[in-house]
Structures are given as structure tokens and as C-alpha cells.
């Protein structure tokens, strides 16, 4: 194991400017999470208002997740070319427009309540997902230039906790708003928060230390020592010709089925199976602990990866998949509400461990700062394509087989993901030799 002395010791000014950069970026992404997962809290309200079954609601979910997945794959190279800051601004303001448009769907009664209205909601939510797909690409692209490979695990944990704060807010706001206000406010409120964070991103975020007036430094990732020109050929070769990145992409497909199968449907499961209103104390407390577990999972994953596994990501992801398998078995058996809540909490922890390690960190490591967005697009895109099946597909399954089929449908995917991580257990990014130099912006410790 490498000694922690391999970590760079940055100047105070560098740390201050980087802090302003990643705090703004992280909370902007958290706001976008609110505008992505709010649909799960309007799921039952939409069904009750318009008389739709789970398969019809699932159509909206599938359209959105499919478009997100495909868009992330194709927008990754674009974000690598235009930079993360521009990509985030495109994403956040697009998401503002289409969250507002989804809420305004409450006032288009002339479409009726049948296929035309479903088509409207599915189209608008798919467009929201297109712009949402820029968010992860932008986040990883910017951070890949600001964080050394030996810092990324822990800082990905910090980012993971910030992102989960957006999820926590929509758990609280969504649950209360859908009960006290018309359902459309579950979309209007996140739109307003995203707009504020978009303007802060414009003001504070910069793509690299150099753009913020700081000296550059060697991040020691897959781009280290790489002087090739960044073009489409370079990006595709860097990511698609790498067996490690393609194996991670396959694992992320499995992650998507489990993650979205859980996150898109668990509020409705609690309402219909456990008979808990979204505003109830038990649901609110349980949802809070689920989010807290996600935050804890990101911290456990980042710390274990950097300090126990020498900045290797697959071993930690394997543990996350194993946790998911155990928890989904408990959900399948459904021994009682306390057990179900406990399984939800640990499942959230396991999902967060995998997500922060693969989409959040391995993409920077194996894509390098030059191709980080392309790698993220591939990983995140495959995750959402895998998740697309939990929309209409899961809706059909639940309509025909009931909630007893929910847990078992996700177990096999978690198992395949765990086996793929065993295959990559010792994988680390390859580096090109670079000229010996003292990294600018890094204050070396005195000998």
C-alpha cells in the first residue's frame, strides 16, 4: 500500500479556491437531484388524479431513464470538448425549464387524461432527463482537473453527501408538498432552487485551477503524461477500447436496475404495502435515515478505497453489491416493517457505495482529466439504460405479480455486478511517464 505521503500538500489559497468551486458545483448537482427524483413523490398523486395504473406511470419513468442513458453516452464527449462549467449551465437551466413545464401539465386539461396527456408528461420528463444528463458529466469533468487521484475517493465521499442532501430535501419537501399543495408544486419548487444554483455556478465555478488563477498540477490519473490532442478519436479510444471501462459499464447497467428499481418505487411501496402516508412521522424518519445511509455509504466507500485499498475502486463496489443482495432478500421475505426499513437503509448505503466508486470516482481515474466526461457518460448512461427497465417494465411486473415480485427482480442484477467487480479487483489506471517536475500549485513538503 502506498503511504499517505503520496498525497499532494496544496497551498492554502489553492484549497480555498477549490473549496468555492466544488461547494457551488456540488450543491448545484444536489439541486438537480431534487429535479430528477421528485417524480417518485408525485407517482401516486398522478395515478390518483388521472386514473392511471402502474404501467402507465412507468411509461413516463422509462422514457426519462432511456433518454438520460443515451444522452449521457453521447453528451460525454461534448462535455469533454466544451468543458464542465458550460455543460453544467446547459444542464441546470434546461432542467429548470422542463421541471416547470411538467408542473404546468396540470393545466393542460384539453389533452384529456388518456394517451395524449401521458405523451405530454413522458416527452417533457424525457427532455428534463436530457438536460439532467449533463450534470454528472460536468461535475466529474471539473473535479478531474482539481483533484489528485489520491484525493478522489475521500472527496467523492464529500460530494456524495452533498448530492444526497438534494435527495433529502426532496424527501422532505416532496412528501409534504404533495399532501399540502397541488402535485405540480413538487416540480415548481425544485425548479426555483435549481435556477438559483445555476446563477451561482455561473459566478463561482471554473473548469481548472489555471482558469481560476491557480497554477496547474499533475493529477496522476490516466491522462498523466498524455500529450495527445483531445478529439473524438482520442476520447473513444481512451474509453471504448479499454476493457476495464467496458467492464465497469456493464456493472453500471446492473447498478441502474437496482438503484432505480429501488428509488423510483419505494415511496409507493411504503404507501400501498405498509400503508404509510408520505407525510407520516414513520415515513419521514425512515426516509431521512435512508438518505443518511446514502451519505454514510459514500464516506465509507471513499475512505476505504483511498486508505484500505490503495485507491482501488472495485473492491469497495463489490462490498456495496453484496450489501444490496442481502437487503433485497430481506425485502423479498418482508418479515415486518422494522426489518423492511432496516433493509431499505442498508440497501441505500450499498447503492451509494457502488455509485460513488464507479460513476463518481472510477470515471475520473480511468478516463483521466481529458476524457473524464466521456467515461462518466458511458458509466452513467449504462446505469440509466439499465434503470429504464424499472419504469414500464417494473410497472407491468407489479400490476401482474404484485409487490412480492419487487425485491427478487433486482437480486440477479446485484449479483452480476458483484462478480464483475471481482474480475476488476486489482484494476488501477495506467499512467504515461511524464517529465520530472515539481507540480505547480502544490507545496512540496520539505525534505
Feature-to-residue mapping (PLM):
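Cytoplasmic membrane-interface "Motif A"-like loop-to-helix N-cap segments
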Residues: 81-92, 306-321
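Cytoplasmic helix-loop-helix junction between adjacent transmembrane helices
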Residues: 124-165
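C-terminal ends and interior cores of transmembrane alpha-helices
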Residues: 93-114, 322-335
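C-terminal transmembrane helical hairpin of 12-TM major facilitator-type secondary transporters
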Residues: 311-361
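Extracytoplasmic gate region of multi-pass secondary transporters
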Residues: 39-43, 242-299, 355, 359, ...
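Juxtamembrane intracellular "pre-TM" segments in multi-pass secondary transporters
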Residues: 2-15, 208-248, 438-447
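Residue-level signature of mid-helix packing/kink "hotspots" within the transmembrane helices
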Residues: 37, 65-73, 167-168, 291-299, ...
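Helix-loop-helix hairpin linking two adjacent transmembrane segments in secondary transporters
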Residues: 159-210
